[in-house]
Curated annotation (Swiss-Prot):
The lineage of its organism: Bacteria, Pseudomonadati, Pseudomonadota, Gammaproteobacteria, Enterobacterales. InterPro entries: DesT_TetR_C, Homeodomain-like_sf, HTH_TetR, HTH_transcr_repressor_FabR, Tscrpt_reg_HTH_FabR. It comes from Salmonella typhimurium (strain LT2 / SGSC1412 / ATCC 700720). Residues 33-52 bind DNA. Homodimer. The keyword Metal-binding does not apply. GO terms for cellular component: cytoplasm. It is found in: Cytoplasm. It comes from the Bacteria. This is HTH-type transcriptional repressor FabR. Keywords: Cytoplasm, DNA-binding, Fatty acid biosynthesis, Fatty acid metabolism, Lipid biosynthesis, Lipid metabolism, Repressor, Transcription, Transcription regulation. PROSITE patterns: HTH_TETR_2. Represses the transcription of fabB, involved in unsaturated fatty acid (UFA) biosynthesis. By controlling UFA production, FabR directly influences the physical properties of the membrane bilayer. One of its GO terms (molecular function) is DNA binding.
Length: 210
C-alpha cells in the first residue's frame, strides 16, 4: 500500500472512531452530524466525501465493524474453550467484556436493529445471522446434532444474549455479575432442552422403525 493510500485509510479509520466516540446512552447515530464527525476526526467537512458517500455509508461501515469485532471475539473464546473451560461461561464472559469495552458498538447494533432505516435494519440482521450461523456451526460440530436443531438452539441463545447485553449497558458491576450468572443458567437450560428434545426425537424414530 502506497503512502497516499495509507493516509487515506488512516483518515477513514479516524472518521469511524470519531463517530463511535460520539455515540452514548443519550445520543444515537441518527443525531450525529457530518460536520461534528469530521471535526472530531480532524478533517474539513468537505474532505469527508473522499472517504464515504454520505453519513449513512459511514454508519453501515460501523455496523459491519461492530458485528465483525464481536464475531472475532467469540471465535477467540471458542479457541480458549478448546484448551479447557466451560463453553457457556467463557462465552458469556467474553460477550460481557465486549460490551464493557465497546458499549457504543453494541448500542449501535441494538438501536439500528429496529431503527427507521431499512438499510441499517438489514445490515444489523445480516450481522446477527452471521453470529447465529457461526454458533450453529460450532454446536453442530460439538454436539453432533442435525443443523435444524443447532440453528434453532443458536437463534434462541443469541436472542437471550442480546437482550441481556441491552440490560448490561446500564447497570453497575455487581448487577452485571448477577446478570452473567442468570444468563449462564438460561443458556444451560436451552442447551439441555435442545439436547433432550433431539434425543426424544431420535427415540421416536427408533421406536417407529422397530
Amino acid at each position: 500500500m502506497g503512502v497516499r493510500a495509507q493516509q487515506k485509510e488512516k483518515t477513514r479509520r479516524s472518521l469511524v472512531e470519531a463517530a463511535f466516540s460520539q455515540l452514548s446512552a443519550e445520543r444515537s447515530f441518527a443525531s450525529l452530524s457530518l460536520r461534528e464527525v469530521a471535526r472530531e476526526a480532524g478533517i474539513a467537512p468537505t474532505s469527508f466525501y473522499r472517504h464515504f458517500r454520505d453519513v449513512d455509508e459511514l454508519g453501515l461501515t460501523m455496523v459491519d465493524e461492530s458485528g465483525l469485532m464481536l464475531r472475532q471475539l467469540m471465535r477467540q473464546a471458542r479457541q480458549r474453550i478448546a484448551k479447557g473451560g466451560s463453553v457457556i461461561r467463557t462465552s458469556v464472559s467474553t460477550f460481557m467484556e465486549f460490551i464493557g469495552n465497546n458499549p457504543n458498538a453494541f448500542r449501535l447494533l441494538l438501536r439500528e436493529r429496529s431503527g427507521t432505516s431499512a438499510a441499517f435494519r438489514a445490515a444489523v440482521a445480516r450481522e446477527i445471522q452471521h453470529f447465529i450461523a457461526e454458533l450453529a456451526d460450532y454446536l453442530e460440530l460439538e454436539n453432533h446434532m442435525p443443523r435444524a436443531f443447532t440453528e434453532a438452539q443458536a437463534e434462541a441463545m443469541v436472542t437471550i444474549v442480546f437482550s441481556a447485553g441491552a440490560e448490561a449497558l446500564d447497570i453497575g458491576a455487581e448487577q452485571r455479575r448477577q446478570l452473567e450468572e442468570r444468563l449462564v443458567l438460561q443458556l444451560r437450560m436451552i442447551a439441555k432442552g435442545a439436547y433432550y428434545w433431539y434425543r426424544r426425537e431420535q427415540e421416536k424414530i427408533a421406536h417407529h422403525s422397530e
